[in-house]
Amino acid sequence: MSVRFLTAVSGRAFNMHDRFGREIDYMRISVIDSCNLNCYYCNPQDNNKNCQVINTLSVKKVLCIVRAATRLGITHFRLTGGEPLLHPQIDEMVSQIKKIPGVRSVSLTTNAVLLAQHAKQLKEAGIDSINVSLDTIDASEYEHITKKPLLHKVEQGIDAAIECGIRVKINVVLTPQTDVVALTRYASKKGTDIRFIEMMPVGEGHTNGVKPYEKVIGALLEVYGTPCHIDTENREEINSGYNNADNGPAEYYSFHGLDIRVGLIQAIHGKFCDTCNRIRVTADGRLMPCLGSSVTMDLVPDSCEFTDDLEKDFVIVQALKAAIKAKPGCHNFNDNAVTYTKTTETKTVETKTTELKAAEVNAARNMSRIGG
């Protein structure tokens, strides 16, 4: 075995930077691409395909990916879906990831429908935090959004996680109908931070048009007065008593009378690409350097055969390096200056090449196919 190989897989982990100088230390892993809800902005066809298990990452494969990632200095891992609690071994997966040297935090994003029955096991497995996707606390509106009358299950899940001592945050995808004040009061009652997320201009989100700062801060200002912006660079102050797992894109605000933080995640109106620190693995085992791009890369080609785990680690490390180096400087969600080339076969032997604007490509994508 070569010296270079030994160094790559058994040497001390180092900090991995992309070609724009950003340190990449955070990985989101979509462990399954099916979901037990059918949210209109995620699955606009209004069918039940979200419930079908198409791709699932095995525990063994996830552990291989995490081990390789830690060798590149990636230390924070978030498990997503689809709905990750549909994965039959999700509790075991969390437990095994936590045992890998170099892992600083493991978190999970869920719709919380199944959280009540998993909360205790996840706590015992060592989960560091859970983000709950919840867009309304009105039962009829919840059913309208998700096509399922399951709000009570979500609330039970949130309560169970909090009772187990798990740090919970609430994520809200902003729409024109979002009741900002009601959701913030609910989060405050539960003692959980809340983050309002700008909908990506993908699929149904292409025509959403809600400006997060105006909608959220404007609504809360009328009730709680002028907010105080929290310096997101001062992580030690913000996360006093917490781990450093939420070193993400949220801008946080505090309000008089609220003992929680209110966060905004604005992919378009508060573009944060220059500080992006993450990379994504899809449920079919591919690497996605950026959500704003339809480009994905092979993690481990199916044709690869390995003599041992060390060799497999080396291949995954090299794939991760390539994906990080390919990470674009910024997303192009609404950029008509960026084009993709689409090649299709015609009825004859000839092929047809079409130039598509990035904004057109994103408008045609389904959010459910991107991953959580």
PLM regions: where:
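N-terminal [4Fe-4S]-dependent radical SAM core
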Residues: 2-30, 38-40, 250-261, 265, ...
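Canonical Radical SAM [4Fe-4S] cluster-binding loop centered on the CxxxCxxC motif
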Residues: 19-59, 72
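Residue-level signature of catalytic and energy-coupling elements of molecular machines
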Residues: 31, 194, 285
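Glycine-centered loop/turn positions within well-structured domains
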Residues: 37, 139-140, 271, 297
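Secreted/processed peptides and extracellular or luminal domains of membrane proteins
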Residues: 41, 45-48, 213, 219, ...
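Radical SAM/AdoMet-radical enzyme domain recognition
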Residues: 56-79, 83-197
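Radical SAM enzyme [4Fe-4S]-AdoMet core and its adjacent flexible, acidic
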Residues: 140-143, 148-263, 267, 311
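Flexible mid-to-C-terminal extensions adjoining Fe-S/redox cofactors in radical SAM and related proteins
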Residues: 268-372
